[in-house]
Amino acid sequence: MNLVQRAVEQGGKLAPIVFTHDLTALMNPSIYIDNGGDILVNVRATNYTLYHSENKQLFPSPWGPLAYLHPEKDQRLITENYLVRLDKNLEVINHTKVEMLNLHTPIWEFVGLEDARLVQWDNKYYIIGVRRDTTTSGQGRMELTQIDIDKETWTVKEVNRDRIPTPEPDTSYCEKNWMPIADRPYNFIKWASPVEVVQYSPEIKTTKQVSLKQGIRPNKDQRGGSQLVRWGDGYLSITHEVDLFKNYLMQKDGIYRHRLCVWNNNLDLVGLSKPFSFLDARIEFCVGAAELDGDLLLSFSVSDNCAFILRTPGILVEELIVEALNYEN
């Protein structure tokens, strides 16, 4: 299913996120509506772009159907973050680069805070993503990055950063794509099958496992994903699943698809839609969701080089919920 087509046919809207910036590509936007009603989006900007040969893949790059294109003299994959404010028509009003604290010298080739989800907890704004540049092996941990937003001058600065450990033992290689629960401060869905809920304590810098229980058993790993946002008596989120493989020439390739997840108030996964695409591209990624006037705003990117907001009509969301609640593996 092409979700954009269905949404637009039912009165929804697809809006690109476009603004001037210092790097090469805009990707993986995370939308959030704050306590004051402002529609905010954190957008990842990178110094590279992704080329992916689509459809029948008649025009691969010299390196295969999927290739990262970056400066020849700097093969690092660098990320910066921008904060954008939209009006209700989903047009860009303001944008600015997030000024990050200079706390360390990056020592791995993935540089910066990647795929950050935007939330407001305890009246503080956070962008929460993975950072992999603090060790020579590229170990990844989610980081809780507190930002201060001056809405008069439209400037944004990082004011505090916590590197979030996993529940003991904190020995895994790469943690990423935890899904923040929008109205439960410092709580995340770490895994979807079984559902693992974890809570980080900023005061003592530790993470505990809140619960671990099996809900629906997806036939593919469901990975984050957007925030969990309130919808009726429960929550909705978007997860992704991916097939990573090599083609007949042993060149790497991949296909990403998404699903709508339905959660009850106890954070049980009770519904899972059929897989869908946004725009029928093979490489797509959704990291943001927000409710606006009964509709669901979804922020996503295509091929790591263009960012969009999809206003999904509430009637279509309800259709997807019915489908999800009737999930059969």
Q: PLM ranges: what are they?
A:
Residues 26, 112-113, 284:
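Short, surface-exposed coil-to-beta transition loops
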Residues 276-277, 289-297:
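Well-ordered alpha/beta subsegment
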